[in-house]
Every structure is written in C-alpha cells, then in structure tokens.
C-alpha cells in the first residue's frame, strides 16, 4: 500500500520515515509546501465572498418580487439553498482548517463538514436533474396538456432533498464514513480504504450508480431531446428568422448547462472512481484536492448559469440593487424580444 491508514483517516504517503501524523492532531506540511495551504485558504475565501452574496441575492430577489415566485423558480431557489449549504457548512470550515494546515476540528467537525458539503452538492446535482425533466416535459410535451405547476415543483424539491439525504446520512451511521481527503483540510466519502465494518465498497457503488450515473443520464437524455425538439420545430416552420434565433438561444443555454455540470462534477467523480478501483496505488495529495475544489466551484457556476442568464430575474435583481430603478431599462427591453421568441419555439411540439 502506498499510503498510511489510521483510525478514521488515510494519508497518501507511506510512513517509512515516521513523519506521518494524524490529520486531526498535527499540521500536514510534510505532504505539500505550506504555501499550498495558504493558496487553498485564499481560494476558499474567494468562493465565500462570491458564492454567498450571489446565492443570497438569488433568494432575496425572488422573495422580494412576486412575479418571480413561479413553480420553476422553486427549483432554482433550491439550487441557491444548496449552494449556501456548501458555502456556510463547507467552505468556511475548509478555509479555517487550511489556515492551520490540518483538520483542527476533529472527528465531529469532519463529519459535519463532509455532511454539509456533500449534502449541498447532492441537492444541487438532483436539482439540475429535476430542471432537465421540467424543460423536457414543457418543451417536448411527451405528456399532452401537461402544465408544470406548484405541486410538481414541491415534489421536485422534495425529491432532491430525499435523494441527497439518502446519500449523505449513511456515512454518519456506519455505512461508509467521512474522512479527511487530499491535503487533509476537507472531508469527503471514504473512497480510499476497505476499513472493516464500514462496507465502503457497497456504499461507493450505490452512490456512483444512484447519485451520479442516474442524474447524469437524466440530464443528457432530457437536454438531448430538447435540442431535437427545437430543431424539428425550426424545420416545421421553414426555419424562420425568429425560430432560428430561439434555437440558437436554447442551444447555447443547453451547452453551457452541460459544460458547467461536467466541469464541476466529472473530474471529481472520475478521480474518486479511480482511487476506489485502484486502492493502494500511489497518488499525491493534490490528486484529489484539485478536482474536489472544481466541484466546490459549482456554488458560483450554478447561479451564473441558471439564474443570471434569466432576463426577468436579471431585471429584478438590478431593480433591487438600484433601489427600485433599473438604469439599463432600455437594454433590457431591447432584449425582451428574444425571450418571447424562445417561448414561441418552446410551445411547438416535435413532429
């Protein structure tokens, strides 16, 4: 084994020289240069000062403007809540522990940080899947005369929380566990060991199938069908200028959504799967640290992609920031036609 396993931790370094110490009790500067911990802390600080205001503003603006309280925006609000969980429960903890060079908060702190960070990520991931289903049902109309209403939105939000808790609670009660990972300043699921009594293997397989493969398949299927529906609608209308413009807008949004999802989650999931299937192989602390913090950056990507590209929300946000006035009123009105065009394209069912 090319690492050192201890009670509730795994250090990616063989303890041949006797310098490996518990990440709950001693600084881990023997793993990487101390400057790396300072960089990690600065990165966490950046995510906090950007992620918290953007997601908090999303909640505040939606509550402030009644016209934004639509069923679809329930899911978008759920995304903001998930991101705030990650910011408050995960990023602040990681920033604090990186300043000390080890997980100074102990086992309880590791469980809490791992739980809240993973919970936020899972709620976010399943919210994206529910959004994909909503877009598919509304645009492609696989169910005739179906309207996405408040009850459907509440069911979608409940589903995201139920699935997220089904993934994050088991490690707290003995099915797998949360341990420090990477530079040992943040905690995650134990992909690294086959510790007796925790059944890590079965939990990781369950998590990857139910909480990564399934939502990823849903997202690709729904957005794939959405693109086909828009193209078929454009062909049926002989590719009018209005439809072409709407098609480009929807296509751009879908591409950004999928790329954002993959950038955030695929590197982390791929590395975690590699570590799980190659337990005992040699890898450095940065091997898991870098993709883990790509995933954490989703707290910024989500509101930018799913909220700030919404013209109506952007107008309300600017109005709120400027105390009831929108200094860019003319520009917003000039862009409103695109929104109408996209809506008209969405109302055409595929041939």
Curated annotation (Swiss-Prot):
Residues 62-73, 134-152, 225-252, 309-351 are cytoplasmic. The keyword Nucleotide-binding does not apply. It is a multi-pass membrane protein. Its main location: membrane. It is found in: Membrane; Cell projection, Cilium, Photoreceptor outer segment. Residues 1-36, 97-110, 174-202, 275-286 are extracellular. Residues 330-351 are annotated as: Disordered. Glycans are attached at residues 2, 15, 200. Keywords: Cell projection, Chromophore, Disulfide bond, G-protein coupled receptor, Glycoprotein, Lipoprotein, Membrane, Palmitate, Phosphoprotein, Photoreceptor protein, Receptor, Retinal protein, Sensory transduction, Transducer, Transmembrane, Transmembrane helix, Vision. Phosphorylated on some or all of the serine and threonine residues present in the C-terminal region. Contains one covalently linked retinal chromophore. The chain crosses the membrane at residues 37-61, 74-96, 111-133, 153-173, 203-224, 253-274, 287-308. Residues 335-351 have a biased composition (Low complexity). GO terms for biological process: absorption of visible light; G protein-coupled opsin signaling pathway; visual perception. A lipid is attached at residue 323 (S-palmitoyl cysteine). InterPro entries: GPCR_opsins, GPCR_Rhodpsn, GPCR_Rhodpsn_7TM, Opsin, Retinal_BS, Rhodopsin, Rhodopsin_N. It comes from the Eukaryota. The keyword Transmembrane applies. Photoreceptor required for image-forming vision at low light intensity. While most salt water fish species use retinal as chromophore, most freshwater fish use 3-dehydroretinal, or a mixture of retinal and 3-dehydroretinal. Light-induced isomerization of 11-cis to all-trans retinal triggers a conformational change that activates signaling via G-proteins. Subsequent receptor phosphorylation mediates displacement of the bound G-protein alpha subunit by arrestin and terminates signaling. Belongs to the G-protein coupled receptor 1 family. Opsin subfamily. This is Rhodopsin. The lineage of its organism: Eukaryota, Metazoa, Chordata, Craniata, Vertebrata.
